[in-house]
């Protein structure tokens, strides 16, 4: 498979995303005015509550069986490593470049969370369909490759809606805390500076008693709050959809209820799939709509973009090659080179589109997110081609 053929295959899904983003940008422009901020916020809530959970459920229920979980056990581990290593590298980028606090979570998220959704779903079968595909029989390659990509998509959604969701939520809480502290500072500066000194002295013993009580209850309170946060994240609609889909896929009798031509409740799966198909187009045009405002007012510096590009398209693929080849030499992976290709590809993908949904949901850095997505997806056209060529050379 030549470089130019691979360039065409690898660039198609990325160009598709860019075209859909341009549609959203045009609809949100001053000339068109069909997609204002209020419309984008409302659509984003529909994606979060309905479309994304349906997509997670439909993909996991259809593609994941207990046998697949056992034989493909390294894929969840590999994906966890992409999030862990990408998060650490993103943290280094934050420490080196020192961006504004509200951008820190976004930078770590874009470095760690790759687009495990529509890109592998399009890219892997497309490589199988090529006449000179190195992965053998076209129909077998396409069927198996689509299963790998679908499993990757479902797992990626689970990681993104737990780990990445927490990062963006943390940034939003940090911004909220800064705003509240500024309000308190303004109020205290406007308060009566001539207050009675004796009042403060009389209040001191009571303050000390309250402090002791708070210290005693602080540990348990923190533990309860931490468990409450975990429960909230697990009950987020996309995560809940992934968990239910995982259960239906792994339990055979539940799977037989909704999967298959003769399944009595097959309408549930077909409805979920139909709703889930709206996720990627809606997320992409929302991202494009935010892009107009982002290009006008974004605070993203070129060095931040360069740092993320270096992490996603230089450091991560090199580390991924080392991890996958080491795992193969240790006998952890199936002999199928297509499986190993998908594992390497997970280290090379541009940032997840779901990040845009999260920033819109919490109203934090959505303009900057659109700008980062634009540049990373433009670079992805060449990066995916070059690294796919290297992966195929190493595996075949």
From Swiss-Prot:
Give the UniProt tissue specificity note.
Expressed in seedlings, cauline leaves and flowers.
Provide Cytoplasmic-side residue ranges.
Answer: 27-45, 95-106, 166-229, 295-312, 359-370
The molecular function terms of the Gene Ontology recorded here are:
auxin efflux transmembrane transporter activity
- Key word DNA repair present: no
Induced by what? Answer: Up-regulated by auxin application.
Sorted alphabetically, which keywords does the UniProt record give? Auxin signaling pathway, Endoplasmic reticulum, Membrane, Transmembrane, Transmembrane helix, Transport
Signal peptide (from-to): none
Mind telling me which GO cellular component terms the entry cites?
endoplasmic reticulum membrane
One of the GO biological process terms: regulation of growth rate
The disruption phenotype is: Increased root growth and lateral root initiation.
Q: Where in the cell is it found?
A: Endoplasmic reticulum membrane
Ranges facing Lumenal side: 1-5, 67-73, 128-144, 251-273, 334-337, 392-396
* Topological relation to the membrane, as annotated: Multi-pass membrane protein
The question of whether Ion transport is a record keyword is answered with no
Transmembrane ranges, per UniProt, are 6-26, 46-66, 74-94, 107-127, 145-165, 230-250, 274-294, 313-333, 338-358, 371-391
* Source species, domain of life: Eukaryota
What is the similarity comment for this entry? Answer: Belongs to the auxin efflux carrier (TC 2.A.69.2) family.
Task performed by this protein: Involved in cellular auxin homeostasis by regulating auxin metabolism. Regulates intracellular auxin accumulation at the endoplasmic reticulum and thus auxin availability for nuclear auxin signaling.
Task: Tell me the protein's name.
Answer: Protein PIN-LIKES 5
């Amino acid at each position: 498979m030549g470089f130019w053929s691979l360039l065409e295959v690898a660039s198609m899904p990325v160009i598709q995303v860019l075209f859909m983003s341009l549609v959203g940008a045009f609809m949100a422009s001053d000339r068109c005015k069909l997609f204002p901020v209020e419309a984008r916020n409302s659509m984003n809530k529909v994606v979060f509550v309905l479309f994304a959970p349906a997509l997670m459920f439909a993909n996991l229920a259809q593609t994941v069986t207990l046998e697949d979980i056992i034989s493909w056990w390294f894929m969840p581990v590999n994906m966890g490593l992409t999030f862990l290593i990408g998060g650490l590298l993103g943290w280094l980028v934050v420490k080196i470049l020192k961006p504004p606090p509200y951008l820190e979570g976004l930078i770590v998220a874009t470095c760690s969370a790759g687009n495990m959704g529509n890109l592998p779903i399009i890219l892997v079968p497309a490589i199988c369909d090529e006449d000179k595909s190195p992965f053998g029989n076209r129909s077998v390659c396409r069927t198996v490759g689509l299963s790998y990509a679908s499993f990757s998509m479902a797992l990626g959604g689970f990681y993104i809606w737990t780990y990445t969701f927490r990062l963006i939520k943390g940034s939003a809480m940090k911004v909220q805390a800064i705003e509240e502290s500024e309000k308190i500072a303004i109020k205290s500066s406007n308060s009566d500076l001539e207050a009675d000194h004796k009042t403060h002295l009389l209040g001191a013993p009571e303050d000390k008693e309250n402090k002791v009580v708070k210290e005693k209850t602080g540990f348990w309170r923190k533990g309860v709050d931490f468990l409450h946060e975990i429960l909230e994240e697990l009950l987020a609609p996309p995560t809940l959809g992934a968990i239910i889909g995982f259960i239906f896929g792994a339990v055979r009798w539940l799977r037989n209820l909704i999967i298959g031509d003769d399944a009595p409740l097959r309408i549930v799966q077909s409805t979920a799939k139909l709703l889930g198909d709206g996720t990627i187009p809606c997320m992409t045009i929302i991202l494009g709509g935010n892009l107009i405002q982002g290009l006008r007012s974004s605070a993203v510096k070129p060095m931040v973009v360069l740092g993320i590009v270096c992490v996603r398209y230089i450091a991560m693929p090199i580390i991924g090659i080392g991890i996958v080849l080491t795992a193969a030499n240790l006998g952890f992976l199936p002999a199928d080179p297509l499986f190993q290709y998908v594992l390497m590809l997970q280290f090379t993908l541009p940032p997840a589109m779901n990040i845009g949904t999260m920033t819109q949901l919490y109203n934090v850095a959505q303009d900057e997110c659109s700008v980062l997505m634009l540049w990373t997806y433009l670079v992805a056209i060449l990066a995916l081609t070059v690294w796919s060529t290297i992966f195929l050379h190493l595996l075949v």
